[in-house]
Regions:
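A solvent-exposed interaction/effector surface
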Residues: 51, 55-58, 74-280
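Terminal helix-turn-helix DNA-binding modules in bacterial transcription factors
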Residues: 3-16, 34-71, 98-118
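Short, charged N-terminal helix-start/capping segments
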Residues: 1-9, 66, 150-155, 207-209
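Sequence-specific DNA-binding recognition helix
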Residues: 13-33, 59-95
Length: 280
């Protein structure tokens, strides 16, 4: 049902549509949706539409009327009221002067029955050298987090939505494993953040802070596209490749003074991590 909603978000989605795609009755499909996601399909669809529309208002030269119409809202007034309830600001004001807002980032519910052999065949890992410029990163620290799940337990899983609302230098938020000199407290290695220009002077959300990162060289490791339910295997595949790879082969050594970077695992592009290196 989530996949169907994502693929048909700009269209009218009815209970019958969700029932058909899930092969359940409309009543039971709705019940399952609420049980697993904590909200009705209608609320889920509205929140997702509002968040998608906010990104359009931030990034495109588009009117509030056009966005409201294209996202299927019955009237501009109705859209404006819904936008204000969701984000606490008027859509016109937001499009003129974007500020960080808590975008809706829904949890993806994966079927419990998985085939552990789905990714057992030989798969390629692509590696390339990239240069990242000097930049600031707006981050939200944890306490003892060392990976995604412990981070979510400490600070919540909604941070990503807020970071997504901030226009990023790299086009999307990032997760970082910080080197020791950037940790505070020292036990918190893993953080989420968004890379921005060195002269960024926009709003810093409450509870967030800014760190400065120098221009640096990275090895980008990217796996092949994967089915969403196989995301754990996709991540492990890249971690194994990183452990086995010797950057000295191309004249580099690992750099422990810059953070390792994790991009959002998206099946259609493959899992991606960036590991810092330096010239030998």
């Amino acid at each position: 049902m989530q996949d169907y909603i994502s693929e048909h978000l700009s269209e009218e989605i009815t209970p019958a549509d969700l029932a058909k795609v899930s092969s359940f009755s409309p009543w039971y499909a709705r019940r399952l949706f609420i049980e697993h996601l904590g909200m009705t399909p209608a609320v889920y669809i509205r929140r997702l539409k509002l968040s998608k529309s906010a990104l359009r208002l931030r990034d495109e030269n588009v009117s509030v009327l056009d966005v409201a119409t294209e996202m299927g809202f019955g009237s501009v007034d109705g859209y404006q009221r819904a936008f204000r309830r969701e984000f606490g600001c008027n859509p016109k004001e937001y499009s003129t002067s974007p500020v960080p807002i808590w975008l809706f980032t829904p949890s993806l519910i994966i079927e419990r029955e998985r085939n552990d052999d789905n990714m057992s065949e030989i798969r390629n890992v692509f590696i390339q050298v990239i240069e990242k410029p000097a930049r600031k990163v707006i981050i939200k620290r944890g306490i003892k987090a060392t990976e995604y799940w412990s981070y979510c337990k400490e600070v919540g899983c909604d941070v990503w939505g807020l970071l997504t609302s901030i226009k990023s230098l790299s086009g999307e938020p990032v997760c970082l494993w910080l080197p020791e000199h950037l940790r505070k407290p020292i036990t918190n290695e893993y953080v989420q953040g968004v890379e921005v220009e060195p002269d960024y002077d926009g709003t810093i959300p409450e509870g967030f802070e800014v760190i400065d990162l120098p221009a640096s060289t990275y090895l980008l490791f990217r796996g092949e596209p994967f089915a969403e339910e196989n995301y754990v295997s996709a991540i492990t595949e890249i971690w194994d490749a990183e452990k086995k790879y010797d950057p000295a082969f191309i004249g580099y050594a690992w750099d422990d003074k810059n953070p390792r970077i994790q991009l959002e695992p998206r099946g259609e592009r493959g899992y991606i991590e960036l590991v810092p290196v330096k010239k030998i």
